[in-house]
């Protein structure tokens, strides 16, 4: 089979960096270098060039999809003779720990909110839907955070279902990485945004990923456009370890940090601890529960060194 024939067999259109960047068309840059610096994660290099070449074309594509979805809603309202409720367009972002999901989510939130339509964009992470530590300890799951069993999936599904049903105010629990737990009474209210970005390890998973807790609908059933942020496993491990080292010098030094004891480690000890955490927990979760969902995504961003995206795959 020729390469051309193979390319026709895949459900994705594939773009290298320059091909994708050309699809920006004339979309203006609406973020300053200072704003971009504030959006990036602790262990990432996010440049003006990266936003211009990767995220501006993506925001243009999403704007087309969102506008098309609004027209479809208007057609339905005209057919029914009703004034419909405001239904958010839901974008999900999945990928491994340390791949840069949160940065992708924050950049898209900033860009999409600055389109001429001035749409309201909310960002929610699924970390808030992890069971509280008290529950995880009772169930012996503290070392399985991020695995399917660790999430309150019924609450997460109800959250997205209520949003898609037009509920005026929906609450989401909020997670603190400082205390490594859900914040008691710290719920965030989401009030019918135009766009909701849902970021987390598990947003592409379906019912077959939760055989222990069967239910008829799943988060992915309510998502309009899904993104998977991908990278080679060796880079993911390096990024995870480097992020751990930066936390050791920063967030872990806070006496209130759940991981405060790690701040006392030497660099060599910290590397050993981070490597063990990666191999025993995060790598296992990636291989068993996250990576198998990649091909369910509408779009796959593949990163190389320095968190730079070098390939984009868009579902046909």
From Swiss-Prot:
Catalytic activity, reaction form: (R)-pantothenate + ATP = (R)-4'-phosphopantothenate + ADP + H(+)
GO molecular function, one term: pantothenate kinase activity
Pathway: Cofactor biosynthesis; coenzyme A biosynthesis; CoA from (R)-pantothenate: step 1/5
UniProt subcellular location: Cytoplasm
UniProt GO cellular component terms: cytoplasm
Protein keywords: ATP-binding, Coenzyme A biosynthesis, Cytoplasm, Kinase, Nucleotide-binding, Transferase
E.C. designation(s): 2.7.1.33
GO BP terms in the entry: coenzyme A biosynthetic process
InterPro entries: P-loop_NTPase, PanK, PRK/URK
Binding site for ATP: 95-102
The organism's place on the tree of life at top rank: Bacteria
CDD domains xref list: PanK
Pfam families per UniProt: PRK (PF00485)
NCBIfam families according to UniProt: panK_bact
Family statement drawn from the similarity comment of this UniProt entry: Belongs to the prokaryotic pantothenate kinase family.
Protein name, entry field: Pantothenate kinase
Organism, as annotated: Enterobacter sp. (strain 638)
Taxonomic classification: Bacteria, Pseudomonadati, Pseudomonadota, Gammaproteobacteria, Enterobacterales
